[in-house]
């Protein structure tokens, strides 16, 4: 700009902008030629997707590699701490004398480090599914949390969870298998409701304290899943989209 010749040169704002635009155009041509010549950017280098292991994702536990978290453009995937535990899977059926309990085994949670998904932030790009070493897609198979009950009910995938506080209680609403379930927990007391049942029990002995009404068998294992996820996502040290929304709501409600 005249410095090389020792001449003073002052550009007007318009001249400076034209100079920047032209420099960017010329630089882009250089970048283009370099990219086309670099095999790292060629089709042959990217025809194969990331390696898959052949295993399938489930609601709990996975490789815990966390690859799905940084590859999401919207930060929709996050981690949760869930205690290692065995969730009892049982079915309760109404009978003239109360309820008959059929135990089906347990659902093991082996890893404290769990992956979860905030569906409100997801644009269904599938990028996390591409990079996940397991099949199924974290955005679909992992616990899908929603920021409102309306968003949960409107979701086309038909599965997920909405968690909120109601006074001292924690309420978890879930859509599972095309059904809407609601679990209300306050202290040790729980109320588990669905389209054809309304049960009450104590978490210290769920199977032994069941009372209420049901028009058929009820999967009590689903209540354990809702309870575990609700407690985990709102745990005091957890910082995630659900706990943040809960903290904001409590702050707005405080005098």
Where are these regions (language model features)?
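Iron-sulfur (Fe-S) cluster-binding modules
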Residues: 1-55, 125, 166-255
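Phenylalanine-focused residue identity feature
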Residues: 41, 60, 78, 99, ...
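Ferredoxin-type iron-sulfur electron-transfer modules and their immediate structural context
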Residues: 1-121
């Amino acid at each position: 700009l005249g410095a090389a010749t020792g001449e003073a040169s002052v550009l007007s704002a318009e001249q400076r902008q034209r100079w920047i635009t032209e420099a960017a155009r010329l630089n882009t041509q250089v970048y283009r030629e370099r990219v086309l010549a670099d095999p790292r950017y060629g089709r042959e280098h990217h025809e194969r997707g990331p390696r898959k292991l052949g295993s399938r994702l489930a609601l709990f536990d996975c490789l815990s590699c966390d690859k799905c978290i940084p590859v999401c453009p919207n930060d929709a995937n996050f981690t949760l701490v869930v205690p290692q535990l065995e969730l009892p899977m049982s079915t309760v059926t109404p009978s003239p004398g109360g309820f008959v309990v059929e135990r089906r085994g347990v659902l093991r949670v082996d890893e404290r480090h769990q992956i979860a998904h905030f569906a409100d932030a997801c644009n269904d790009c599938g990028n996390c599914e591409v990079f996940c070493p397991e099949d199924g897609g974290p955005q679909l198979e992992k616990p899908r949390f929603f920021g409102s009950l309306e968003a949960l009910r409107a979701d086309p995938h038909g599965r997920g969870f909405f968690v909120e506080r109601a006074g001292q209680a924690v309420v978890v609403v879930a859509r599972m298998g095309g059904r809407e379930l609601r679990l209300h927990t306050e202290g040790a007391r729980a109320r588990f409701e669905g389209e054809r049942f309304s049960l009450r029990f104590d978490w210290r002995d769920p199977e032994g304290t069941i009372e209420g009404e049901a028009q058929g068998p009820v999967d009590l294992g689903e209540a354990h899943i809702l309870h575990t996820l609700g407690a985990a996502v709102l745990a005091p040290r957890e910082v995630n989209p659900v706990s943040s929304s809960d903290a904001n709501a409590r702050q707005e409600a405080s005098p």
